[in-house]
């Protein structure tokens, strides 16, 4: 397994797919990285030369991925909560942030339904 940005990427998959195992790299970014490094998308990770691996590492190092990206996202959410914006309040309360209805759904964000005693008749 090749190690890129602290993540072991699978050997038997194509490089374009294997790079998506790194947090912050999707399919589009993966294709851009390979184009900049001059590597074919169809080649498998196990068939990469050490020079090609180094070229991929250099391209990935120029992008914010893994821990740095997670930290930045968390800091952005924390900033929204501190300034007291609507989005920050929704984050703090554990409710949907992007305007979804909460009367019936939003179970993923709100958690398991809690029964209220004395509600049934």
UniProtKB/Swiss-Prot annotation:
Pfam families: Ribosomal_S13 (PF00416). One of its GO terms (biological process) is translation. InterPro entries: Rbsml_uS13_C, Ribosomal_uS13, Ribosomal_uS13-like_H2TH, Ribosomal_uS13_bac-type, Ribosomal_uS13_CS. Gene3D superfamilies: 1.10.8.50, 30s ribosomal protein s13, domain 2. Keywords: Ribonucleoprotein, Ribosomal protein, RNA-binding, rRNA-binding, tRNA-binding. Residues 96-121 are annotated as: Disordered. Disulfide bonds: none annotated. SUPFAM superfamilies: S13-like H2TH domain. Residues 106-121 have a biased composition (Basic residues). Part of the 30S ribosomal subunit. Forms a loose heterodimer with protein S19. Forms two bridges to the 50S subunit in the 70S ribosome. Located at the top of the head of the 30S subunit, it contacts several helices of the 16S rRNA. In the 70S ribosome it contacts the 23S rRNA (bridge B1a) and protein L5 of the 50S subunit (bridge B1b), connecting the 2 subunits; these bridges are implicated in subunit movement. Contacts the tRNAs in the A and P-sites. This is Small ribosomal subunit protein uS13. It comes from Streptococcus pyogenes serotype M1.
């Amino acid at each position: 397994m090749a190690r890129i940005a602290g993540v072991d990427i699978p050997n038997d998959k194509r490089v374009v797919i294997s790079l998506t195992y790194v947090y912050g790299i999707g399919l589009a970014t993966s294709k851009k990285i390979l184009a900049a490094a001059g590597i074919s998308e169809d080649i498998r990770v196990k068939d990469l030369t050490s020079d090609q691996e180094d070229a991929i590492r250099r391209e990935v190092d120029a992008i914010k991925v893994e821990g740095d990206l997670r930290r930045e996202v968390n800091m952005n959410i924390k900033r929204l909560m501190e300034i007291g914006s609507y989005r920050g309040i929704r984050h703090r309360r554990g409710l949907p942030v992007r305007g979804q209805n909460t009367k019936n759904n939003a179970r993923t964000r709100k958690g398991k339904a809690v029964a209220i005693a004395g509600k049934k008749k």
